[in-house]
UniProtKB/Swiss-Prot annotation:
Gene name tied to this protein: uxuA
Cofactor names: Fe(2+); Mn(2+)
Listed name of the protein: Mannonate dehydratase
PANTHER family: MANNONATE DEHYDRATASE
InterPro entries: Man_deHydtase, Xyl_isomerase-like_sf
Role summary: Catalyzes the dehydration of D-mannonate.
Catalytic reaction list: D-mannonate = 2-dehydro-3-deoxy-D-gluconate + H2O
Keywords: Iron, Lyase, Manganese
Entry EC no(s): 4.2.1.8
Domain of life the protein comes from: Bacteria
SUPFAM superfamilies recorded: Xylose isomerase-like
GO biological process: D-glucuronate catabolic process
Listed NCBIfam families: PRK03906.1, uxuA
GO molecular function annotation: ferrous iron binding; manganese ion binding; mannonate dehydratase activity
Amino acid sequence: MKMSFRWFGPTDPIPLEYIRQIPGMTHIVSAIYDEPVGEVWPLDKIQALKSTIEAAGLQFKVVESVPVHEDIKLGKPTRERLIANYQQTIRNLAAAGIEVICYNFMPVFDWTRTELAKKLDDGSTCLAFSTREVEQIDVSQGIALPGWDSSYAHAELQSLLAEYRGIDEGRLWEHLEHFLRAIIPVAQECGIKMAIHPDDPPRPIFGLPRIVKNRDDLARILAIVDTPANGLTLCSGSLGAGPQNNVEALVREFGGMGRIHFAHIRNVKITPEGDFEETAHLSSCGSLDIAAIVKAYHDVGFQGYYRPDHGRMIWGETGKPGYGLYDRALGAVYINGMWEAMEKTA
């Protein structure tokens, strides 16, 4: 299992030199952030990013993410040009030595949280989600949730939401299938492994359909194009926020098939009301048995890439919520410690 750390490029407040100092850290997960969604990522930009990462003594093999344009998800006629661009981006990433591409198929928003800095009993802060707060929002008046204000202008957001009123889960499945049948053969030819990320949280939000939320959804996606190039990013926190999901069992099933190409490992504390907050990685801090999840990866012989996912803000750190240095570093060494113990006692 190869440890990686997400880095948001030159604007990330965390220097690569600090990331390299985490014991066992070998890889960076990043992306090209200044290209408009739907346009081809230029090879020279990819190579420049790779050179920056390698100059710090780290490797760049996983991209997170190559965004999927809304026109593809909506099934608009413009999708064919956008899919062709996506195919070329896959080719360019392969030419630069990338092995895994993480992506998602969530309509409109990649993630949903109602708080970016919920204070915990120990004084740290975390990302959190309140079902009640989301249900009380009148989408016709706009959506003012953390992380969303700069995503869309009000009129643009309302127009996009209106377009999705005609898209139910069945149609979104059709559009995902069309997309996969177009890109997976290209990925396979290039030696790239595509890894779809689950919905976060794994439930419909604001009437928008969600189709990557549970075991049956994941199995259906893999069956659309049944090849190792069509795989999963298995995010324990995203899937684990749904009480219907047994993350350990998912790792054993899909990891045993060799279809998990990228692992996001984090803990969440969930409530009967469907609320959750992101905790420290330690099993006792949340609702997930992280030790059992890591053991499942070990038992199936997982040799892919993983990263400690979102962390709390601790020790006075400020920066991008969920993506501070300190707590993610603690998560990394916690996971690596368990992995080493399993290796030496196997």
